[in-house]
């Protein structure tokens, strides 16, 4: 594994091998399980520029999300989409490459809604700068958004610029029964939730409220439910989905589970129980077939004409 310390070394590392893939802290290893020379961003870390008054920051790809969150918190700001795997050591570049967002996506959108600019190395080994460093920049194609969720197939991300939001004055989490009467009452409320989540079991609904303290207290009184510790959202962001246990085939239906996340606009389900179970798998796992788009193929051809970076079909 190559570990460059500067963006110039990063570009040279990409040019050094016919097939490469940039990796961060390794918190999502199944998404980078391809045959290629790995280029680590662990030494490409640090906040390059931060303008609290402009609500933007620029940081190197290997910067831990926890470090970024701490710096933003000092100025009462944050990334509203709730990046995943922060405590596990997830990096800014990894958040962009995977495009994964947490509970805050329900209200604020995902990673692609906050990225402004990027510096990355294309398949020809060129260090390119695309996008801008200001929120109002709207010139040209919004290519940085193509890199969100690309898993490194268009280029190796070296530096990213994001916009941020002011941190709300207060937050409050409610646990409600997941039944028609409660949902009807909640839907009629005049307040907009910050995040929603249905934990495994489907018996309860978690609602996060954010804003001025008195306002969310009034909202909670109107909606009802039980106030719970807001740390539950941190556990959701760390995606504690994996478990290991010895069971017999007859016991499988008992362990069938579904997690419906309004926050991430996605539902993970295993149904019927015996048919959705994968015990072993050496390759990255995908749900369904990957749709092909002419625009995506054209971008790949323009940025990586020789296929230096692995594609999703590899």
Which sequence ranges carry the predicted segments?
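N-terminal glycine-rich flavin-associated loop
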Residues: 1-22, 41-88, 100-133, 169-176
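Conserved active-site and cofactor/substrate-binding residues in soluble primary-metabolism enzymes
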Residues: 5-9, 63, 67, 87, ...
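Short beta-edge/loop segments at beta->alpha junctions of small alpha/beta modules
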Residues: 24-30
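Conserved glycine-rich FAD pyrophosphate-binding loop
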Residues: 32-34, 42, 202, 225-314
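FAD-binding subdomain of flavoenzyme oxidoreductases
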Residues: 88-194, 201, 205
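Short amphipathic alpha-helix segments
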Residues: 176-196, 217-222, 244-260, 271-274
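Terminal amphipathic helices with adjacent charged low-complexity linkers/tails
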Residues: 208-226
